[in-house]
Regions:
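Short, Lys/Arg-rich, polar N-terminal cytosolic tail immediately upstream
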Residues: 1-13
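A structural signal for multi-pass alpha-helical bundles of membrane permease subunits
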Residues: 15-259
């Protein structure tokens, strides 16, 4: 009996050691790129920090990136939150599956296949070289609709039925029941949307011609690779907001689930 317990403890200890080693390897693999990004920035000279056309170019690109990220996430969440709720509330199972399959189809469709139709649409409505054109082309996010649909399906239908019996309208059901319950999903979706908009590259390359409207990802791509320290410093400034936002989102979501 004691021998079996000792063997179990030894096996458990070996498993913990193995998991610890694997975790350490994974940590090193994830941390090394950050080290290679941060440490070269200490060798940069202050006079070389702004070797672009001007400091205002970098600030303008940062502003454009912030506009795309903040305005984009607001538009996407309003559309996806409403669409996810509407699909979940459809009484017909076939109709619900039709919308879900449509979202999955657009989710699996390569983004490059939509570039030409999007370009033609923006050209015909006169929004080709503008940030609002980019915002419109990124407003529909199938993955976000599916996420909010999944969140809505997890809500007990008796909550909606009881509120409906008390005279609540669909707007009240949406605002008082659905939105508060799915708030953690909204937080996660907002972060993923901001991260995607922050790193947007293909659409700006295709739809924007005026350099004053370029996001920061375009400016970084066009920087010369001769000065690696400068590029690392600007990349670090580029990712710092996302890192801060990530930890804020993790803290917010974990606190909500623990409540």
């Amino acid at each position: 009996m004691f021998g079996e317990k000792k063997e179990e403890r030894a096996m458990k200890s070996r498993k913990e050691t193995t998991y610890g080693i694997l975790l350490l390897i994974a940590t090193v693999l994830f941390v090394l790129p950050c080290i290679f990004l941060v440490f070269p920035t200490f060798d940069i000279h202050r006079d070389d920090l702004w070797q672009m056309d001007s400091l205002m170019e970098f600030i303008c690109a940062y502003k454009n990136t912030a506009i795309l990220a903040i305005a984009g996430v607001l538009i996407q969440i309003v559309i996806a939150l409403s669409a996810g709720y509407a699909i979940a509330r459809v009484s017909s199972f076939k109709a619900q599956m039709f919308f879900i399959v449509t979202c999955v189809f657009f989710l699996l469709l390569p983004q490059q296949a939509l570039m030409l139709p999007q370009y033609l649409v923006l050209m015909n409505i006169g929004w080709l070289d503008s940030l609002k054109g980019l915002l419109m082309m990124t407003a529909f996010q199938p993955w976000m609709i599916l996420l909010f649909w999944f969140a809505a399906k997890r809500i007990d239908s008796s909550l909606f039925d009881a509120a409906t019996c008390d005279g609540a309208s669909n707007w009240v059901l949406f605002r008082k029941i659905y939105v508060p319950i799915v708030r953690p999903y909204v937080t996660v979706a907002a972060f993923l949307s901001i991260a995607e908009s922050w790193n947007l590259l293909e659409q700006p390359m295709t739809f924007l011609q005026n350099k004053e409207k370029y996001p920061l990802s375009m400016i970084l791509m066009q920087l010369s690779t001769d000065n690696a320290e400068l590029k690392n410093a600007l990349c670090l400034l580029f990712v710092i907001p996302l890192i801060i936002l990530f930890f804020r989102v993790v803290d917010n979501v974990t606190n909500r689930f623990h409540q």
